[in-house]
A protein has these predicted regions:
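Short beta-strand->loop micro-motif that forms the acidic, two-metal-ion catalytic signature
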Residues: 45-49
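Catalytic core of pol beta-like nucleotidyltransferases
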Residues: 1-26, 35-40, 50-109
Length: 109
């Protein structure tokens, strides 16, 4: 099983690359790692806010996969600020949970 130290190092590695190469407005760690829980199936879940991204989600992920090098299983969710605002107005429980329980790694709190 992967140790907390290994996850912490990989999170730092990925976040540094994101800041340097992808230039997001905000990065939030969510899921089990944000809660400090490590299980066999744990991966790194990152919620990213960025204004200038492709229209479709799959294109956003392809863009990230081409830029960012990572060693551990990492999932990215990318929203434009206006998409985030819209999801919150709709009361999206998934997004609300990320913002309430996630850990801001980069950007204003």
């Amino acid at each position: 099983m992967i140790s907390k130290n290994q996850f912490d190092e990989e999170i730092q590695n990925v976040v540094e690359q994101l800041i340097r190469l992808y230039k997001p407005e905000k990065i939030i760690l969510f899921g089990s790692l944000a809660k400090g829980e490590i299980k066999e199936e744990t991966d790194i879940d990152l919620f990213i806010i960025k204004s200038d991204v492709p229209e479709f989600g799959a294109d956003r992920i392809r863009q990230l996969d081409a830029l960012i090098k990572y060693r551990l299983a990492t999932d990215f969710i990318v929203y434009r600020p206006e998409e985030l605002e819209h999801r919150l107005k709709l009361g999206d429980p998934f997004v609300k949970n990320i913002l309430e329980e996630g850990k801001v790694l980069y950007g204003a709190g």
